[in-house]
Amino acid sequence: MGTSGKCVDGNMNGNGEGDPIQSSNCTNSRTQRWSFGTDATLRVQNMCMRPASEPPSPGTLLQARACDQGPYQNWLYRSDSSLINAASGLCLTDPGALTSGPSQLSLASCTGGANQRWTFT
C-alpha cells in the first residue's frame, strides 16, 4: 500500500504496539505488506492502523496498535483512492509525499491531493 511511489511502513522496531506508521522507499518488507481487512481495518503483522490520540484532529499521527475493533481503527476506501478514518472523517495523509526520505503518516482534512491517494499492490 502506498502513495506517490512510496510504501506505507509499519516500522515495527519493537513489538509493534505504538510504533509509528510512516511512508518510506518500497522494499517489499513484511512491515510494508498492508491489507484492507473485511472488518474495514488496515492491517500489517496482526496490528491495525489507528490514530495516536483519540479523538483525532488534523495533524494527529498514526500508530500500529493491537486490533480491537475500536471505531478509530475503521477506514473507508473511496473511489478517488483516498482512505478516510470512519470515526473522524479525516483522510490518511503523507505530509512528506514529495520528499525522498521517510515521513510519519497523519490525518488531515480531505483535499483530494496526491498525498491522500492510496493504492494497494
What would you call each of these model-derived segments?
Residues 1-121:
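Lectin-like carbohydrate-binding module/patch detector with strong preference for beta-trefoil
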